[in-house]
């Protein structure tokens, strides 16, 4: 059976469901299509930064968030030092959270459904059709049926199968991430701090360009994981599952870990807007599909929620009829400066000696680590007037001017 909607959203994760909710609230007839049945799991650290918390509050989820664990900031460990940094930045809530993706994604999807978006779950989009002017006029499902649309939002994740059909290209000369996470029982599962171990070593003792994490979930378990940065020239030199098991053994006594990590899932993450082909006449890529992932920590939920809202606003504003250049331009206005300088810093971390030399120095400076937490947490806005924000924006402008490939191009 074929159907039709004003807006079709492919993907019911945080980005797609946020876009669907905002578009439905603007009066659009919305259909969300996802290959999975919900609830479903997703490879993720489950962390919700203060910026992500702010977006969830915009969606009306404040009361739901109040029932979840709250974290005051980030505890960082490594190179012989430990430091706790409260979440900085004047423009966002003072706390973060962590919610398993089986719960978070289904909750945001339910918000979109309550707002009027229709759900087609367990249904995969495999292709699109175009009208005579080149606009997408329908998505093709794996059973051969179609869903017609006036506008299309693609939020099908980092690999973005539909994005590739539409012409998305991933440029691997900048950094990308590889990561794995699991869940493990710990008596510290209700701690009000998330922990990152910045001195991530392989079982052979080699310092890796990445970090390990322990994110308390408040349910008796922590999200445990490891992630590493890589480039086409310097691919990740680590087998992820053995590395996570080794990391768990290192943390076992300190965290009272019980058993082995369960439900291990890994991911490959394009980062920092390292894709082109993110829009066409009546379609846009958002969230992970548009490589909206922080190059310094692999976080993407806040960008997914934001780009979902921004895409819906662009679609429903009535002022733009062709998104081919409007959407990349909007993404660049919001994220290109930060992504550009973050990609350069992350690239330095892939150099074998850089982290070993700079890590011990940085970890002994509360000022440097406060700056690091703020930029890693995406906690700088254009409205912030303090010196850290001004320096970060200036560095982003300078970095963008010398980019061989600007983010999203």
UniProtKB/Swiss-Prot annotation:
* Catalytic activity, as annotated: menaquinone-9 + AH2 = beta-dihydromenaquinone-9 + A
| Class in the EC hierarchy, top level | oxidoreductase
Binding positions for FAD per the UniProt entry = 11-15, 44-47, 101, 125, 288, 300-301
Gene3D superfamilies per the record?
FAD/NAD(P)-binding domain (3.50.50.60)
Keywords assigned by UniProt, alphabetized: FAD, Flavoprotein, Menaquinone biosynthesis, Oxidoreductase
PANTHER family reported for this sequence: CONDITIONED MEDIUM FACTOR RECEPTOR 1, GERANYLGERANYL DIPHOSPHATE REDUCTASE
This chain belongs to which protein, by name?
Menaquinone reductase
Q: Which GO terms describe its biological process?
A: menaquinone biosynthetic process
EC number of this enzyme: 1.3.99.38
Q: Which family does it belong to?
A: Belongs to the geranylgeranyl reductase family.
What this protein needs as a cofactor is: FAD
- The question of whether Heme is a record keyword is answered with no
Pfam families listed in its UniProt record: FAD_binding_3
